[in-house]
Amino acid sequence: MSKHIFFISLLFLSINTLSAEELSNVDVTSSVFSNSVNESKYPLHIMQNEEINVNKSIGDNLKGLSGISNADYGSAVGQPTIRGLTGNRTRLLSNNISVNDLSYISGDHINNIDLNNISHIEILRGPSSIFNKGGTSGGIINVISDIISEDKYDNEVFKLDYNSVNNGYGHNILFKRNLFDINMYLSINNIKKGNYSVPHGVLYDEGVEKTTLANSDHKNQNMSFGLSIPREWGYFGISFENNDGIYGIPYHAEEEEEEGHEEEEGHRLFTKVETETYTVKGKVNTVPFFNSIDYSFRNSNSFLKEHEEDGSASLDSNSNSLAFTFNLDDQSYEKRLLLEYNHTKSPMTGAYLPSSESYDRSLAYFLRTKNKPYEIDFAGRYESNSRDSNSQKYGDTSLSFGTSLSSNIGEALRYNLSYAHVSRTPTIAELFANGVHGATSRYERGNNTFSREVSRNIELDMQYAFNEIDLNLNLYRNSINSFIFLKDETTTTSGKTDATWSQKDAVMQGYELSMSRTYLIGNNNLMVTLSRDDISGVFDDNTYIPRISPAKNTLSLKYENQKNDIYYLDFIYSESQGDMSSIETKTNSYLDLDVGYSKKIVLDTHKDLLFNIYGHNILDKAIRNHSSLIKDHVPMAGANYGVDVSMRYKF
């Protein structure tokens, strides 16, 4: 019934003849190209700063977007998934440089990204993502801030934030100003969240109902500092970021096997993470043979320690990355050449992975037509990668490429037809795992004889503007050779379930449909967006790929008046998922309703105050996320409410 209501709403929106203000196409300049390459015609999402909740994980923030799901492991860990593709198939960037963390090797590891004070988040697919990073069969999620800026700050500010949520709080300080022709950026924030509440009747321990989820707490501190010097010849910038946090592991499979164990609260299972990142970025406009050269160097040391009752395991990732982007534009084409090198040392102690080293070397080229009634994009990428442990070695070379054709049919319809051939080198976990992974209570085994994973994706994107309504439809089919996945076995080792990294050919296909319209009500605006996405994932033996999210229907309303009042509502109806692998159980459908209100109060020309009041899952429905490794044992949070207060002084 809910699905029928959703489609009736779509029909109502399309035939409604109330006077409305046309929602024009917004040109978006993607930051992965530093020289203003327009990305607005691609299957692309942009989430602006005011839409982001810093108390949520990045996956939880993005899950309402079509084609995006959240692979959570409790409230702290939320890894974004694009069209069912997880791990390093979906690459997370910070200001165009890969984020150094351990999330790509396991679903219980947190993304090392700070969402405070960012400008926006952009999601890219197609030739753009192939050019920028290797193995991105899912796409790129790029988190943008101006900690290093190639332009002089025009929004100099001192800001204080306070927020409360989940029996906890958070606060943030931001100082951003240009002094002595130097951009100065300083951000300090911390967050402390307690165990979250769960809906009535969804969680029991030995027959006793639980109202909160043990070990769902999260504490984190972050400090970021940046200096940048913008000049006519280009710019130069440096930054330092430190992240230090602790988060609970809300599920430990071993507890199911124990008899007469203590109360759940007595089992303190948690992970400590710390990361230090140093970045140098710049651009030179006056160089022989090129229009400009962009360069970046990042040194990042990420430390993760899993604490359990029977000991601890330490996993490190010490990464050095270097990149040069050359602008070769001429009158007929926009062209880029990228040289990239990354070396990662991963010392491990007591972990299910051996110590290892990874080398990634790549050469990429991007071309786009100019001044034509159509646009053709092409990206090619050559990679030479190696993964070495003390006793095992793996190496390969690969070629990835993608192309797209975009054009108008009449004045109302625009289409983009694209094809991408993407090769992905296996990760160190997929190759070398051999031991007990405590957080998931599995004995994982890798395979260093794996072949490269190769995806071939064809996609049609259509954008149609009719009677002040914007329609967007994406159709895609992704055939993947040697798809790598973790398969649970029926045997055990050392009391843990055996889990083997395996390969099979697979096909993922689906669609994404969205419709939006802005209504002018007096002098106020009401933005209405409806969307639906659906995906299927099947192996060549007609079994299902694990943890493929079910069909999702979304309604978003945003009402803004002339008095700086903003009201918003986000409603998600996730359908049941019965297309499951042999290691999964069926996931029931659910409703998820979030609401909020924000008010900006201008105190004078220099000071303003912003209030934001919000509620998540206000219907207090039981929500189990099919994309999660632990959905059967860890429900999502019940109804919870929060307040953000921000005082801003503009210089």
Question: In which residue ranges do the predicted regions lie?
Answer:
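N-terminal periplasmic "start-of-domain" segments of outer-membrane beta-barrel proteins
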Residues: 25-53, 79
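Flexible loop and strand-edge segments within Gram-negative outer membrane beta-barrel domains
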Residues: 214-220, 234-293, 297-319, 346-350, ...
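Outer-membrane beta-barrel signature, preferentially recognizing the C-terminal barrel domain
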Residues: 259-287, 393-394, 408, 421-480, ...
